[in-house]
Amino acid sequence: GSSGMIPFPRV
């Protein structure tokens, strides 16, 4: 999420 790489969790 932080790098904008889905589906990475934004925790």
From Swiss-Prot:
A GO CC annotation given for this chain? extracellular region
Q: Which residues carry this modification: Valine amide?
A: V11
Query: What is the top-level taxon of the source organism?
Result: Eukaryota
- Alphabetical list of InterPro entries matching this protein: Periviscerokinin (IPR013231)
What does UniProt give as the signal peptide span?
none
In which family does this protein belong, per the annotation? Belongs to the periviscerokinin family.
Q: What is this protein called?
A: Periviscerokinin-3
Protein species of origin: Nauphoeta cinerea (Cinereous cockroach)
